[in-house]
């Protein structure tokens, strides 16, 4: 894939909402939210952000590459842990300002806490309490990342 001029210029509303050209809208920080979901189960795995270059890299290699807002660097998911996310499909919303990545999660999980999903708790309706939703740890993050 040619990495230059990958994305179409943003056109009018009709072109953005109904057209056949991918022209993502990045926010004022140059980022677009990307929700990774298991391609088979549709379970939400994690929410991360991409900049233009990380999205290009993702399209080129077929694996999720994010932009780390805290470290200010590219984050090839699984480069350290081996828990890569193979891209099955990328969807964009009507405004092309948010992405859903349907992925094949390789390895024990997507979450740095050792769980398959970062969404392992739910808010009890009408309260501010959280309850676990089956988020047992599937790997030891200290062993994988070398951090306590």
Predicted regions and their residues:
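C-terminal binding/interaction regions
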Residues: 2-31, 37-41, 45, 50-148
């Amino acid at each position: 894939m040619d990495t230059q001029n990958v994305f179409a210029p943003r056109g009018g509303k009709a072109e953005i909402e109904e057209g056949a050209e991918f022209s993502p809208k990045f926010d004022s920080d140059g980022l677009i939210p990307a929700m990774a979901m298991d391609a088979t189960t549709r379970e939400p795995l994690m929410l991360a952000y991409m900049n233009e270059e990380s999205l290009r890299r993702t399209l080129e290699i077929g694996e999720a590459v994010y932009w780390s807002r805290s470290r200010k660097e590219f984050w090839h998911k699984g480069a350290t842990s081996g828990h890569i996310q193979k891209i099955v499909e990328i969807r964009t919303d009507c405004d092309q300002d948010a992405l859903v990545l349907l992925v094949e999660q390789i390895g024990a999980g997507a979450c740095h806490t050792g769980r398959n999903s970062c969404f392992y708790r739910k808010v009890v309706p009408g309260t501010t309490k959280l309850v676990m939703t089956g988020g047992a740890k599937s790997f030891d993050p200290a062993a994988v990342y070398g951090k306590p």
